[in-house]
């Protein structure tokens, strides 16, 4: 049989369409891999999900794997997106995983903390990908913390150097210790994007006062207290986020249902915005700023909802105009305790819902910041999901908005 040129062109076109259709059908055009850590099982578990570019819908990748320890509580990823770090609260371990091309995880190293403090509550990677900050509930050798005591008088912030291969080194020495002391009951840690400072939230239930410990940071991990630190921060601050230009810090006050906003002035000093605090839903906890620095999203644990705010790029003021009906919108599963915005395109918000073992997903309107529920959610996850992390699939570029 002999084809004419027209027939050959038609055949080539048909084959191309068939191949494109087959590729689309087999591949949901993944933009991100999402890692959720749950602490119901012993050891804890991590489930990998892929996020669809068009809908934001999540699909499981394989079966859950061990978190490498007991009670995983926080996750962080390297800035090259090749490594995942998990803090296991129950046995004081930090576990490093390599991330495969399909989102698969392989455990490569475990660090058991002792001199660095114990009972981790939060971890965070600096923007350079060279330091991992770990907030521990107790100082070395302590199982309680009493404010004002001679010893065991607070929590501990440890700083681990991260090698070019993603491996964790020995904790940086600060004043002869493998940590710097912070207030009692630390809850969250946040390094600024420019690397100049890091902040730790903590609260004193006896006095009913919350604080942020602020530290000036060097590229090598040395920390020195910022003038005026600790900074007053409501009653029970439990979540911290900062904008990508390192000009503003945002904190959730779990006890007073409010969002506290600060401008960062000279040398990392925090100054509360004059028109704050700002109303949230009930029991706000986890908080995130989108990669462009335009919107804030926070999880309300009691309301089972997400509150959304637009950021005034000049002043840092959060406006709830994108979420005018408060907690009655953006419904999640039961007790959302973790939240993230996808790093691939910054178009989707996900929450980990602790009590009903699920993830909720929302699509962001890039022009307004409003949320709409993603397809087929909520998504069943591992038991008692407590931490979320994500890496983009492929190369994506997100432009940070400047004032």
Residue ranges and their predicted role:
Residues 1-6:
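N-terminal secretory signal peptides that target proteins for export/translocation
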Residues 10-22:
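Bacterial N-terminal signal peptides
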Residues 22-403:
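Predominantly soluble domains enriched in secretory-pathway, periplasmic, or organellar proteins
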């Amino acid at each position: 049989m002999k084809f004419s040129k027209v027939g050959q062109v038609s055949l080539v076109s048909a084959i191309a369409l068939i191949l494109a259709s087959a590729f689309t059908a087999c591949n949901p055009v993944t933009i991100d891999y999402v890692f959720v850590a749950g602490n119901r099982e012993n050891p804890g578990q991590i489930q990998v999900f892929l996020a669809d570019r068009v809908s934001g819908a999540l699909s499981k990748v394989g079966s859950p794997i061990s978190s490498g320890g007991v009670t995983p509580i926080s996750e962080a990823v390297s800035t090259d997106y090749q490594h995942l770090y998990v803090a296991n609260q129950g046995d004081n371990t930090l576990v490093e995983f390599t991330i495969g091309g399909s989102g698969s995880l392989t455990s490569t190293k475990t660090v058991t903390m002792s001199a660095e403090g114990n009972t981790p509550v939060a971890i965070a990677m600096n923007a350079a990908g060279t330091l991992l900050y770990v907030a521990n509930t107790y100082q070395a050798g302590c199982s309680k913390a009493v404010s004002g005591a001679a010893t065991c008088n607070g929590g501990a912030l440890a700083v681990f150097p991260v090698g070019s291969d993603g491996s964790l080194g020995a904790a940086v020495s600060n004043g002869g210790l493998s940590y710097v002391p912070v207030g009692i009951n630390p809850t969250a840690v946040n390094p600024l994007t420019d690397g100049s400072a890091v902040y730790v939230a903590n609260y004193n239930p006896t006095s009913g006062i919350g604080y942020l410990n602020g530290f000036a940071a060097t590229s090598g991990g040395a920390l020195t207290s910022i003038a005026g630190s600790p900074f007053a921060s409501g009653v029970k601050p439990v979540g911290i986020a900062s904008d990508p230009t390192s000009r503003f810090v945002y904190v959730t006050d779990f006890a007073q249902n409010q969002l506290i906003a600060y401008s960062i002035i000279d040398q990392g000093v925090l100054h509360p915005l004059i028109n704050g605090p700002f109303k949230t839903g009930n029991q706000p906890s986890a908080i995130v700023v989108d990669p462009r620095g335009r919107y804030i999203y926070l999880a309300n644990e009691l309301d089972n909802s997400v509150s959304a705010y637009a950021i005034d790029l000049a002043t840092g003021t959060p406006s709830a105009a994108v979420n005018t009906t408060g907690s009655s919108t953006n419904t999640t599963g039961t007790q959302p305790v973790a939240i993230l915005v996808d790093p691939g395109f910054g178009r989707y918000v996900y929450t980990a819902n602790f009590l009903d073992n699920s993830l909720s997903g929302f699509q962001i309107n890039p022009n307004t910041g409003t949320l709409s529920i993603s397809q087929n959610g909520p998504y069943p996850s591992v038991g008692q999901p407590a931490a979320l992390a994500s890496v983009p699939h492929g190369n994506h570029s997100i432009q940070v908005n400047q004032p």
